[in-house]
Amino acid sequence: MPLNKDIKRVLVIGSGPIVIGQAAEFDYSGTQACEALKSEGVEVVLINSNPATIMTDKEVADKVYLEPLTLEFIEKVIAKEKPDSLLAGMGGQTGLNLAVELHDAGILDKYNVKVIGTSIESIKEGEDRELFRDMMNRIGEPVIKSEIVTDLQAGIDFANKIGYPVIVRPAYTLGGSGGGIADDEEELRTILESGLQLSTIGQVLLEKSVKGWKEIEYEVMRDSYGNCITVCNMENIDPVGIHTGDSIVVAPSQTLSDKEYQMLRTASINIINAVGIEGGCNVQFSLNPNTFEYAVIEINPRVSRSSALASKATGYPIAKLAAKIALGYGLDEIKNAVTQKTYACFEPTLDYVVVKIPKWPFDKFFGADRQLGTKMMATGEIMAIGANFEQAFLKGIRSLEIGKYSLDHKKFKEHSMSELKDLVMKPDDERIFALAEMLRRDYMIERINKITGIDKFFLEKIKWIVEEEQRLKLSNIEDLDKEWLKNLKKKGFSDKAIADMLKVSPEDIYRLRDIWSIKPSYKMVDTCGGEFEALSPYYYSTYEQYDEVEVSNRRKVIVIGSGPIRIGQGIEFDYASVHCVKALKKLDIETIIVNNNPETVSTDFDISDKLYFEPLTEEDVLNIIEKENPYGVILQFGGQTAIKLANFLKEKNIKTLGTTADQIDMAEDREKFDELLERLDISRPKGKGIWSVEEGLEEAERLGFPVLVRPSYVIGGQGMEITHDEEELTFYLTNAFAKDKKNPILIDKYLMGREIEVDAISDGENILIPGIMEHLERAGVHSGDSVTMYPSQNVCDKIKGKILEYTKKLALAIGIKGMINIQFIEFEGSLYVIEVNPRASRTVPYISKVSGVPIVDIATQVMLGAKLNDLGYGVDIYKEPELISVKVPVFSTQKLPNVEVCLGPEMRSTGEVLGVGRTLKEALYKGFVGANMYPSKEKGKILATINKHNKAEFLPIAKDLAKVGYKFIATTGTCKLLRDEGIDAEEIRKIDEEKPNILDIVKNREVDLVVNTPTKGNDSKRDGFLIRRAAVERNLGVITALDTLRAIADVELEEFDKNKDLEVFDITK
């Protein structure tokens, strides 16, 4: 039981959907916290809207509510469950903001709920820019010259007084949202306007820019008795000016003198004591590289992205200990789980180097402004561990899955030196390659240091890597002797990088290593630099002498993880990997996980029997397989990252459990797949590959418009578009062939039907479909961006029978053992297959939770030989539940300048929320509220710009919205359409007409909701694009699919009292 006997039932608020700035790290920390509380005999009540998380599994907390994270719904949970305490710091910025709002609204007092861990007062002092600055002044900690402003003019006046550039930091926002660096008044106006709108209290800190100073972070722990330690200090390679979430970060710091290290450590402890933190806290400093001058940037009075990184870098479980501290324990009373001998008051010691590199989404968004600044844009990150900086850094580069194994990037070879200088002075996501190219051309390190602010230490290390690359390029394989190869491996060079430089194959380098016995050894992450014996089975590779892995004779399976979070491959795959590991453990199989993502539950050291924190490349994975000699390897749960290893493992005669490389090829090769469907007598939309605009127009005439067009080789719908007439098709094809003449464009008949999706399990004889999911938006919107309903609402028994028949035929014909995901279209009473994925999909966590079928557990048992009939869930289609569950996508496009908002065949969402209700409309209402898509009725104004193809469909929806009180603003054509039907509408001028025009009313937030159905293309100069961007940057709802608007109108027409009639549901029941 907890030290504080008054704590019996604790409410934990999760962080909600994955968005840029708040990703999987809060699933990791929230899961740790819930398990720590339960281990102390405390009952845990969890509210979180994100169904893709481990945290919302019914085993993690005693009561789990997948409900919107709003005061209205949290109060319902508090009223129903009557918790005595609230733990606020585990749900990121979302959880922290909600705790403050619950306090300020009097809800905590009303239900007698006390905040444990860091208090509301301490949260406010850490988050409110003015209170924090005043406190720093009181305790004598330096802050940068700054001013708190709540209006535009005050900000401009202050900037004029201190001079540009200035940094804008809004209060209570996430990942630097609404912030930035302004070099002049025009930039300041734009950033300030955004920052004031996005801050929950309308407050912004303006400070004199110290861009170019070092950015240093300390992760600190403190208990209620005042005991305080620093867990880890971290150094951003990128100086102040780039958000720490977009910076390459090294732990421990590499360039601080002992005096600087101790000075900032002392400051961190002074700050955490003054604020009164009880738990974990992240402190960020700027440090003048030429003097001992420093300033406090900010603190995060909660677990954070940096604390997840610090936990994985050190093996010190910050979130778990923060939860125990909240229960009243002191650091000197909590045992270190890694050593089982020392206590949590011992500061961790690192005898290795950790490098974190962000993963950006720009491969999905070609038009995005890639320049990095104080607003975070990365969706995820990788972490690499090495015996030295070079090794960790090169491991990190190849972990990013961008096709790069070295710092040699062809793109930058064509750039002039002045272009390269511009690139490193205005850094983007590829700046490290531009910097390497400058060093390759012998540009002086001192000058690069001066123009970038990157420390000479790191530049010298990168210079050494570049010089070795050049030396290899000028050599041949006969020049590569044993000592040189061994040194290259010690410094992190992969076989592929060495082979590419020598113009041989990686297999040639592997053979040399084999002959010379140059094999990796594996070291343990033990928190204590080897001072005490560690029990944690947490390893990284080096090429040092001693190996710390003990290989057992048990039957063992290696599970390949999914790597960094990105659009199209998110936290859902980590969920699947973790459940696979748990299922294997139940079967008494030794489980080994390989992954490189510091944010996730899968890389918690006590999830698997062994954790290898390594890149997910062919060489790094093969090294581990050769070390461990497993019974088999599971790829099905690691998304495309794991699946793309299938052919390589087949070539090496390594057994993959479940679906094989040949079966994957059958599903993914268009020609083979078409032949399979024909053989099975299964329909798919008609289409073919075309090589010219003329051929495309002929094929479209044969098929009939609309048609779906896309490049040949795409992932996640990249480059797909629906065209409605010859003009649109010609526009698309002309641009597509201008970019790529070597590959055909695929053109298919676009069926504007109902999209249906299933995740199924096959044992080779039977299949089990846990549930049939129906998409709200018609085909043409990527499945990951669609609102998804379960049970399906409009699928008749005849079609359900066809779905079962087709799924069984496909699974058995392909030879699936484990999971298969199939997407269908129902069109005019017929069923068509549009896609088959022979692996786990992103809907697995959702359908597992809402159907009650432990899909991954069953699939894992099937891979190892079990039969579905023996596993207790039957075969064919599982019975449907009474409650209706709706999955609603969540987008982060606000964080990505110049990125298209419009829904289409290419996936854009970063996360999702769940809405659960007794009726579809209740579930939709909760889902829309949770995703922040539901319009507020205070103004009740909808801006509507509808293209010619959608006007007839829009009218009845507009009538229903007008009926419940919404007012419309529209440009001439749409306005006339509405008035002709008797709907009151206000006319507004187009963008190219005099002010105030349509763009002005969006920028001034004079509307509640923007409904914009796009015309052709994604041209950033088009009016529709500019309107959508302006709306999303001002946090206004944007709807581009009329099916979504129809659903909102249906919910509005419903007569239930949204405050009184809506129940909250505990999914553990």
From Swiss-Prot:
EC class name: ligase
Region span, Carboxyphosphate synthetic domain: 1-401
Gene coding for it: carB
List of residues binding Mn(2+) 3: 823, 835
Superkingdom assignment: Bacteria
GO MF term list: ATP binding; carbamoyl-phosphate synthase (ammonia) activity; carbamoyl-phosphate synthase (glutamine-hydrolyzing) activity; metal ion binding
Domain statement: The large subunit is composed of 2 ATP-grasp domains that are involved in binding the 2 ATP molecules needed for carbamoyl phosphate synthesis. The N-terminal ATP-grasp domain (referred to as the carboxyphosphate synthetic component) catalyzes the ATP-dependent phosphorylation of hydrogencarbonate to carboxyphosphate and the subsequent nucleophilic attack by ammonia to form a carbamate intermediate.
Gene3D superfamilies attached to this UniProt entry: 3.40.50.20, ATP-grasp fold, A domain (3.30.1490.20), ATP-grasp fold, B domain (3.30.470.20), Carbamoyl-phosphate synthetase, large subunit oligomerisation domain (1.10.1030.10), Methylglyoxal synthase-like domain (3.40.50.1380)
SUBUNIT field: Composed of two chains; the small (or glutamine) chain promotes the hydrolysis of glutamine to ammonia, which is used by the large (or ammonia) chain to synthesize carbamoyl phosphate. Tetramer of heterodimers (alpha,beta)4.
Domain MGS-like: 932-1069
Keywords tagged on the record: Amino-acid biosynthesis, Arginine biosynthesis, ATP-binding, Ligase, Magnesium, Manganese, Metal-binding, Nucleotide-binding, Pyrimidine biosynthesis, Repeat
Official protein name in the record: Carbamoyl phosphate synthase large chain
Positions with a binding annotation for Mg(2+) 3: 823, 835
Reactions listed under catalytic activity: hydrogencarbonate + L-glutamine + 2 ATP + H2O = carbamoyl phosphate + L-glutamate + 2 ADP + phosphate + 2 H(+)
Residues reported to bind Mg(2+) 4: 835, 837
Region (Oligomerization domain): 402-549
Binding-site residues for Mg(2+) 2, renumbered to this chain: 298, 300
Native species: Clostridium botulinum (strain Alaska E43 / Type E3)
Lineage of the species this protein comes from: Bacteria, Bacillati, Bacillota, Clostridia, Eubacteriales
Pathway(s) this gene product operates in, as recorded in its UniProt entry: Amino-acid biosynthesis; L-arginine biosynthesis; carbamoyl phosphate from bicarbonate: step 1/1; Pyrimidine metabolism; UMP biosynthesis via de novo pathway; (S)-dihydroorotate from bicarbonate: step 1/3
Purpose of the protein: Large subunit of the glutamine-dependent carbamoyl phosphate synthetase (CPSase). CPSase catalyzes the formation of carbamoyl phosphate from the ammonia moiety of glutamine, carbonate, and phosphate donated by ATP, constituting the first step of 2 biosynthetic pathways, one leading to arginine and/or urea and the other to pyrimidine nucleotides.
